[in-house]
Amino acid sequence: MKKYTTALWFLVCFMMLQMFIPFGIEQVWNATTGNSDETIEKLIIENSVPTIVVIILFFAMRWTPFTRAYMQSRPWGVFFWIVIAALGTIIPSAWLQEQLPALPNVLEQEFNDILTNRWGYIAVGILAPIGEEMVFRGAILRILLTANTQQPAPDSRQPSPIIPIAISAAIFALIHLNPAQMPHAFLVGMLLGWIYWRTGSILPTILFHWVNNSTAYVVYNLLPQSQDMKLIDLFGSERAVILSVVFSLLILLPAIYQLHLRMRRV
């Protein structure tokens, strides 16, 4: 029970920082500039500063342990297939999203505004992958997996990690506070949880997260209209959409298999 309380404490700390720091920034911004309008610069600062504080806090308190052991194992093959897998999830995820009932995209405009600014990449492409992986995989999932292994299992078998991974993925999806992002965030959270469980390191998950967010940034800036388009609008026909999904799966599934072969704890 103590470990579950610890995991809950990590989540509460993350949420409190994400809530109160932006509020404080807004008050200071409005008082110093005399302008209460929501600007892109203010949005970027409100998204970046809490994440920086999260990174510093979780590192300083050792809530997310860091060692050199994983990098010393020279996991270059794992990193390569992580990048391939991350790229392979993009189109299938978009296709699956289109098959689901339309969900409210309450943060769409704010997210798009951040993506239009070069400094927004620091918030979305660099800080978010590091901060979120430190919290959701390096802290919360780590504690849940530890608690899970301490539970008695029938026939002395190793307890399955699926429940801790699913719990952390669900929390990861809900914390985005945007229903339209939750299905993708949950599925990616499951994959990231599996990667963390197999490696015991957040470096591969940070890399995956970075590729995912960086791709969103690049696509939006190359094709700003893509946010309002479906895959059929991009590829021109239903047949081309299906072929793109199949091609992506032919990238994703072998990448996952290679990761299964290569990933190990050190």
Q: Where are the model-predicted features located?
A:
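Alpha-helical transmembrane segments in multi-pass membrane proteins
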Residues: V12-R62, F80-W81, L243-S244
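Membrane-interface helix/loop boundary segments of multi-pass membrane proteins
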Residues: G131-I167, W194-S201
